[in-house]
């Protein structure tokens, strides 16, 4: 059976919620889905003082896990217009897999969050997608079959490059129903593509 990994980093729970929605969508395609997160790099006392959400249910991923999946969907919050250092650090450890071509032909995708509408979501998606392309993966975005990314009657994330959410400057805004629907749509699209390519 086709296997999909939703790999994420979430400091405050927004990307965790998006990861769960991506996984729900992937499961709709009839594939096996695992959700894992990358290790935290921030010292525990700093994470506590900054109110990081440290009680996340997803297990910690190991770099060798990546070879076990037909599709890998990567999510992380935006940090100054690029992926967070926790995810970058994890992907930087994939040099051995890259050298062996171990990820060639796997399907990949990206999702993210930012504090504001113009807070670097697309550049962050591209920073993730660049890694996936270097790994030899087939990248699937969030196409315009998801009409929710065209909405003008509400503040909403979403781009053809991947699902996104807007958190607000203080992080109080949680992913909207429309943003979660976009995440589910992208998860399903990636899973269906992986199933077609890998059976």
Curated annotation (Swiss-Prot):
Q: What does the note under cofactor report?
A: Binds 1 FMN per monomer.
Q: Entry's Pfam families?
A: FMN_red (PF03358)
The EC code for this enzyme is 1.6.5.2
One GO cellular-component annotation of the UniProt record comes to: membrane
Instruction: Tell me which Gene3D superfamilies the record gives.
Output: 3.40.50.360
Is Metal-binding there in the keyword field? no
UniProt binding sites for substrate:
98
| Top enzyme class | oxidoreductase
* Binding residue positions for NAD(+): 12
Record's keyword terms, sorted: Flavoprotein, FMN, NAD, NADP, Nucleotide-binding, Oxidoreductase
* Top-level taxon of the source organism: Bacteria
Single GO molecular function? flavin adenine dinucleotide binding
Q: Which residues bind FMN?
A: 10-15, 78-80, 113-119, 134
Q: Where is the Flavodoxin-like domain?
A: 4-190
Please give the catalytic activity noted in the UniProt record.
Answer: a quinone + NADH + H(+) = a quinol + NAD(+); a quinone + NADPH + H(+) = a quinol + NADP(+)
Q: Which PROSITE patterns match?
A: FLAVODOXIN_LIKE
Cofactor dependence: FMN
All disulfide bonds of the chain are none
Q: Which HAMAP family match?
A: NQOR (MF_01017)
Q: Which family does it belong to?
A: Belongs to the WrbA family.
Q: What is this protein called?
A: NAD(P)H dehydrogenase (quinone)
Q: Which organism is it from?
A: Bradyrhizobium diazoefficiens (strain JCM 10833 / BCRC 13528 / IAM 13628 / NBRC 14792 / USDA 110)
* Taxonomic lineage of the native organism: Bacteria, Pseudomonadati, Pseudomonadota, Alphaproteobacteria, Hyphomicrobiales
């Amino acid at each position: 059976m086709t296997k999909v990994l939703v790999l994420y980093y979430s400091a405050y729970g927004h990307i965790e919620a998006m990861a769960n929605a991506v996984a729900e969508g992937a499961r709709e395609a009839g594939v096996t889905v695992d959700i894992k997160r990358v290790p935290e790099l921030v010292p525990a006392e700093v994470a506590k003082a900054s109110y990081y959400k440290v009680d996340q249910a997803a297990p910690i991923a190991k770099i060798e896990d990546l070879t076990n999946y037909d599709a890998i969907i990567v999510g992380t919050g935006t940090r100054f217009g690029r992926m967070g250092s926790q995810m970058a650090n994890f992907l930087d450890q994939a040099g051995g897999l890259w050298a062996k071509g171990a990820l060639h032909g796997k399907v990949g995708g990206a999702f993210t969050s930012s504090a504001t509408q113009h807070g670097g979501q697309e550049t962050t998606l591209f920073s993730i997608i660049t890694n996936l392309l270097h790994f030899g993966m087939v990248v699937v975005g969030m196409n315009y079959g998801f009409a929710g990314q065209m909405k003008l009657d509400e503040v909403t994330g979403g781009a053809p490059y991947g699902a996104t959410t807007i958190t607000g400057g203080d992080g109080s805004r949680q992913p909207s129903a429309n943003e979660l629907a976009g995440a589910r749509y992208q998860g399903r699209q990636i899973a269906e593509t992986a199933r077609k390519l890998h059976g």
